[in-house]
Amino acid sequence: MQLLGTLSWLYAIQASIGSSKAVTADYGSCHDACTLLSGTLSVELGGSHVSDYKHYPTIANGSSVASLFWAQQQQSAQPACLVHVYSPQDVATVISVSRSTNCPFAVRGGGHSDIPGASNINGGITVNMAALSNVELHESEGLARVGAGARWGDVYKELEKSNKTVVGGRLTGVGVGGLVLGGGLSHFSGLHGWACDNVRNYEVVLANGTLVIASNSSNPDLYRALRGGGNSFGVVTRFDLDVFQQGPMWGGLHVWPFQPSVTSAITRGFVEFAHNAPSDPHVSLFAGLGYKQGGFAWAVGQYDALGRVEPPIFTQFKDDVEVYGTAKIVSTARLTSLSDLADELNQSEPAGIRSRFTTATFTADAELLILIVEFFEEQVQKALDKGLDKDQRFAPMLGIQPLTQNLLRAQETRGGNVMGLRDLDAPLVVCSFGWEWSYESDDKVVIDGIKAVLDHSVSAAKEKGLYHPFKYMNYAALDQDPIESYGKENIEFLKRVRAMYDPEGVFTNLVPGGHKIN
């Protein structure tokens, strides 16, 4: 209670000098901020490395703090303190102290980002949301109340008890909050749109410590801004997600060796699927070319929400030696639960590695995709020649995912979002260039390689008239500006909403992680 009284006094002082003055970060104040917070909240003061901290009380089996962060870049950050929050009121207290002292902070939801500062922060306050991970089905309302600290595996396993699910991520270890605030592609996007299009209500702590609900009828401008607009408006502590009936699904990974005939068949089949997808919105597809020690391989993920085995729309991906020039290496396709499929994909992204993603979007075209594959192979080989061949965890990946006409129509049916995409532009393909490696000493080689693939791909697409400016926030690198790609009208709207709900720029200036509105 003493701390709350102190905060009230601090707010009175701030109000007297004007509430619209922009805040500026002051890392030198963070020791005082952490001391203030330790009077009321569960706080662990900084050590020399994140692994020096005590175990989070919310983590079972004595897991280390570092295990809460997927990428090595996040694991190695050294915050001034770690704060465990157990309620929205705790979050409000952290924001109040940060605002009063100008100490920057980061919010850890699922901890799956590789962008520095996104979920762990050097010298500032790291807020652990792991305790806010409840998943409650409210069947009569047709929604699930999901804490912002939950991961998708937790959500799916709980809802499967009632044969229900939501539009969410495809890996069990990805956090709910980050994925939804950045848009969120899903196995169900062809029918229901992005994950953000399926949020009924957001529970949000604002910069002034107020707890509000953002919905279509309450704070509707904030509600729309949160649908793909990122973390510039507040800390979301709960998502109320629309639920629907879901039984067993059919799906899995189909793996082929990397050779020209396979590349041609997969890219052409992918583009054909992207055009035909509106005829069967219950299916989803992605493809990826990856490298691990031993060579390259193609993987195609095929999924059917109705549980149909090999639905006709996937005919072009059957094990046809005449088309592919070779047989599949393996297929994991089976009839199973969504959570099991999410577990399988999660195994492809082990924690503790260094990671960097970047992205671009193009009109779906097989010839362009084949060119991008060539650029990717060339840059991976250059990285191997520069010493990455000795890194057993070096795993570059080129991913392609369709943005189909039915997906973009579904987003409008469900109220729309701020990402600026139109169904007339479809089908599009989102390319993700995600490289994983072990050692900081190889950062420059990897980052240069990723940039070269991206630059060559964008240049080729522009030359062919196939470039689209959209950048998917959840795949965008730190030096990319996804919000800039949303279009002038949406950018101006987001600026107005930010000025209305955060006039001092707390979530712009004191939360450095994530993509901001420029």
Curated annotation (Swiss-Prot):
Single Gene Ontology BP term? terpenoid biosynthetic process
Cofactor(s) needed for function: FAD
Q: Which InterPro entries match?
A: BBE, FAD-bd_PCMH, FAD-bd_PCMH-like_sf, FAD-bd_PCMH_sub2, FAD-linked_Oxidoreductase, Oxid_FAD_bind_N
Glycosylation-annotated residues: 61, 163, 208, 216, 346
Q: Which UniProt keywords apply?
A: FAD, Flavoprotein, Glycoprotein, Oxidoreductase, Signal
Lineage, top-rank taxon, reads Eukaryota
Please report the stretch or stretches of sequence annotated as the FAD-binding PCMH-type domain. 75-246
Please give the residue positions where the record annotates the modification Pros-8alpha-FAD histidine: 112
Please give the pathway this protein is involved in.
Answer: Secondary metabolite biosynthesis; terpenoid biosynthesis
MF terms from GO for this chain are: FAD binding; oxidoreductase activity
| EC identifiers of the protein | 1.-.-.-
One Pfam entry name: BBE
What this chain does, per the record?
Answer: FAD-dependent monooxygenase; part of the gene cluster that mediates the biosynthesis of terpestacin. The bifunctional terpene synthase tpcA converts isopentenyl diphosphate (IPP) and dimethylallyl diphosphate (DMAPP) into the sesterterpene preterpestacin I. The C-terminal prenyltransferase (PT) domain of tpcA catalyzes formation of GFPP, whereas the N-terminal terpene cyclase (TC) domain catalyzes the cyclization of GFPP into preterpestacin I.
* Family per record: Belongs to the oxygen-dependent FAD-linked oxidoreductase family.
For this entry, the protein name equals FAD-dependent monooxygenase tpcD
